Every structure is written in C-alpha cells, then in structure tokens.
C-alpha cells in the first residue's frame, strides 16, 4: 500500500505525475537529500511478508506463521530483524476448539546504521499517516504519532474459540 501525492502547508505539493506513480509502484528511491545516508522512496509505503506452515492430521490442524511488516527498502530486506507478528493456531486439539497464541514485536524498528528508526505507521510528510481520528489503522498495539513519537511494543495475545457442534 502507498499514499502519495497531495499537498501540505509545510511541504507544498508532492510529486504526482505518471512517472512518479511508476516510481511508487516499484518503490524506487526518491531524490537523495544532502546529509542523508540514503534516498527515501516517494510516498508513504506499508507492506507485509506473510509466511505460514499449515499441517492437518485427521481432524486436527496446526498453523504456524510469521508476518514481517515493512515501510521502506530496509524493512523489505529484513533489516528490522525480529519485528513482526509470530503466531500459532491449534484447531481441534480440544474438541471443536481453536486456540491462538500470538507474539507481536516492534522493538527493533530497523535500528541498524546508517538507517534511522522506522517508527511504524509514521511518516514525516504525511503526519496523519495510517490513522483515523488519531488512532492507528490495522493494529491496536502500535500507537499513532498523537500519543508517542516512538512505538516499540512487545505484546502477547491469547485467544480461544469454541465451535458449536451442529450434529
């Protein structure tokens, strides 16, 4: 996903030509600014790598997954290391029940020189970022810029769901 174009009082108009769209589509670097170690891509990008393994034996099923999120090329290349959502789902290990364990980590935030921290869901050109009325869209455990300039989190989540047997 990418937000791009538009204008702000602080920065004026952002690039919005078809050529700029193509750069956004392939996440090409934008202009290199003096004093910066790397060029930023145009727009505000979010992406996710979603890996999982699922195994079913008789009526039981297990699913192990990792969702690696990124906002720039460094995250795309896994420079933010262990950040992401790790999960385990067990279905029917207890009759008609699904059990869920999840661990969310956002503490690395690509703290690897020469890059600066990612501060997930934040963007200096689009200060509202991925939010609605000040609340982050998509993940309740990551704070928006209204509440914090940084948002490292470690969260454990547990869920259980029972399915009614309709026999």
Q: What residue spans do the PLM features occupy?
A:
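Acidic-aromatic/histidine active-site loop/patch
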Residues: 15, 25
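Outer-membrane beta-barrel pore domains
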Residues: 27-167
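Internal, well-ordered domain-core segments that constitute the primary functional module
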Residues: 1-11
